[in-house]
């Protein structure tokens, strides 16, 4: 399968064998070739560019505290893995392309764009820094067909308290039945996806990073499972063409906590071990 737009990612130097994934290590990022993605950290220190050269991140030591690189901010709960964004940009964009993140959080996407020479555009209901514009992803303040790529990591129902803004989609419960007077999580996300389709240029791509969700609930045997990934994928397919589905391994310290594992075993439910990355194209 040819790379989109004749992407120049053809390293002059051989990539060699895939580095072993070891907890705590941060090997330079390289473009991954399978639909199972794994990296031992949320953030990267360096990456291999289009010429096969190892390039250090411009954000080394800025917020990490230990001298390692940190794209976005370490204190932001629910931050996107910067290495996943890097993989998307290296495959589906070129230098100088515009990249939109309509739920920009702590600005991770903008930092990755800076590293690889893309023009980052970020909106958020509660901006955390000056280069993120205030805005609702359900009404993106951009012209039609104006951006080259969109990355979005939306709330997975109510699992994280992102802000005090009552409009926040993270306050909408994906497990409840829709009500006439209250916007439902899936209705809100359908509006977001419609806006992404509107602002994305034809023949360009988007990536949506999301997880299903599970919540224990009194009176419900086995708790409540929310197949958020499947629901959002179905919404996107109504407007765009599916390119692929990536399974991203989650390296979350909470998954290794004995009490969490014990609760999952005794309660007969599963801890979330992976996220989806849905890749779509606007035809």
PLM features per residue range, with description:
Residues 1-283:
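Class I S-adenosyl-L-methionine-dependent methyltransferase catalytic core
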């Amino acid at each position: 399968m040819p790379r989109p737009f004749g992407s120049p990612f053809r390293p002059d130097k051989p990539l060699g064998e895939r580095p072993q994934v070891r907890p705590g290590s941060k090997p330079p990022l390289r473009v991954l070739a399978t639909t199972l993605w794994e990296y031992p950290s949320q953030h990267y220190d360096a990456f291999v560019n289009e010429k096969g050269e190892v390039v250090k991140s411009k954000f080394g030591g800025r917020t990490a505290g230990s001298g390692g690189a940190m794209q976005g901010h370490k204190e932001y709960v629910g931050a996107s893995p910067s290495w996943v964004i890097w993989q998307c940009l290296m495959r589906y964009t070129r230098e100088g392309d515009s990249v939109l993140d309509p739920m920009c959080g702590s600005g991770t996407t903008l930092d990755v764009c800076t590293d690889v020479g893309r023009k980052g555009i970020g909106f958020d209901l509660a901006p955390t820094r000056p280069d993120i514009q205030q805005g609702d992803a359900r009404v993106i303040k951009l012209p039609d067909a104006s951006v080259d790529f969109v990355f979005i990591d939306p709330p997975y129902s109510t699992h994280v308290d992102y802000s005090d803004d009552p409009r926040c989609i993270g306050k909408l419960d994906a497990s409840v039945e829709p009500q006439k007077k209250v916007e439902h999580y899936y209705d809100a996300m359908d509006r977001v996806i419609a806006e992404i389709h509107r602002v994305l240029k034809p023949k360009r791509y988007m990536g949506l990073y999301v997880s299903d969700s599970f919540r224990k609930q009194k009176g419900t045997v086995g708790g409540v499972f929310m197949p958020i990934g499947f629901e959002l994928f179905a919404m996107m397919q109504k407007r765009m063409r599916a390119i692929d589905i990536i399974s991203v391994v989650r390296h979350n310290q909470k998954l290794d906590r004995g009490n969490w594992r014990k609760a999952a075993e005794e309660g007969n439910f599963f801890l979330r071990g992976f996220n989806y990355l849905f890749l779509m194209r606007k035809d």
